[in-house]
Amino acid sequence: VKGIKIVTIGGGSSYTPELVEGLIKRYETLPVRELWLVDIPKGKEKLEIVGALARRMVEKAGVPMEIHLTCDRREALKDADFVTTQIRVGFLAARAKDERIPLKYGVIGQETNGPGGLFKALRTIPVILDICRDIEQLCPNAWLINFSNPAGLITEAVLRYSPIRKAVGLCNLPIGMRMNVARLLEVNADRIHIDFAGLNHMVFGLNIYLDGKEVTDRVLDLIASGEAGDTVKNIPDFQWEQDFIKALGILPCPYHRYYYQTKQMLDEQLKDYKRNVTRAEVVQQLEKELFELYRDPHLNIKPPQLEKRGGAYYSDAACSLIDSIYNDKKDIQTVNVRNNGAISGIPADSAVEINCVITKDGPRPISVGELPVPVQGLVQQIKSFERTAAEAAVTGDYHKALLAMAINPLVPSDAAAKQMLDEMLEAHKGYLPQFKGLQSANASY
């Protein structure tokens, strides 16, 4: 049997040990012969630390998986079967700017929502599309599995602006939501099924089942009563307004707090901002501690401290997806794919996050039809933001970027949109070559 070749771009990421653990665990059904970890020269030291740990993990497990490290992406991609992307263009320093600049204007500063999400997309999409061009030449049959944030917007750009059709976006949020529901009901997560539909970081659980019996109202009652947190590591856990959750009647995701509890979330962020600690700084500290652990030549497993990063279950989700495509499992997973009519009211060529049957030919979305009226509008508004943002990222069109910023529901005015856009274009200009010389004439820096 010819083994499988997986290439992970952004291989020096602190998440990589989880990916390696997931591949080791599945070796019987998913025989990975080569795992190539690719990074850029600036990330070389981290790549070497993570790579050495990966080799120790593989050796301890006794599986014949070769770990290759390189900063030459094209060398790695030749004849790959699966390519995963987990890149952060501009590293965490760029994330800190994405969070801090909007807060200066009294606007939510967050990695994947609002102005921060827009700029992360503007920096990341051109790089991902470059990777797509390499894939087209060097491994045209490979599956691209992206978990760089904002995952939905990046999948949207790949589907609409690259010739690659074998592309899937992946997020750990649906798994995290399922784990949370299991915790609320005090049962094992594999007994829970949730019908997910929406967009990335804008996904709803339309129905919740325990052993095949509908328990949606029971779960919403538990969430409404404030008995247990329903959020993720990086999002504060405010009490939901009980009657609102009951009226909504479906399960929101943790990121919906930015839209339904904007004031509380902003106040909380501003407190941190004034103390000079945003989420990016917290993560920078966590990363430092993780890499100290990874350096230890005696460490040969994934350290439990990795769970503190918001991305727990990410890599496990990736391994499950690869396993199901490779083995034509036809199980149900929640991924970002081309809509093709699965959700009415969203363009067919747009990315949606939805339950899919995973086959050897990729994910097949399970149609849900119309989303409930009270949430349909927000989802469509975010989709029009994403489509406009993707176009701005590809064309470097200043006015398209301004439009994307202004129509985002977290941005309070056209004037604030322009000020933030100009300041963030300047702050990130080293990572935004497509916008060269296109800033508006009267931008004041």
Over which residues does each language-model region extend?
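N-terminal Rossmann-like dinucleotide-binding module
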Residues: 6-31, 35-38
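Rossmann-fold dinucleotide-binding core
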Residues: 17, 143, 147-212
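Glycine-rich phosphate-binding loop and adjoining beta1-alpha1-beta2 segment
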Residues: 26-62
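A short helix-to-beta-strand connector/capping loop
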Residues: 59-68, 190
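Short acidic low-complexity segments
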Residues: 66-79
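Redox-cofactor binding/interface segments in oxidoreductases and associated redox assembly factors
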Residues: 78, 84-85, 146
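Rossmann-fold NAD(P)-binding glycine/threonine-rich loop
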Residues: 89, 93-161
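Long, compositionally biased stretches enriched for glycine and/or charged residues
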Residues: 186-445
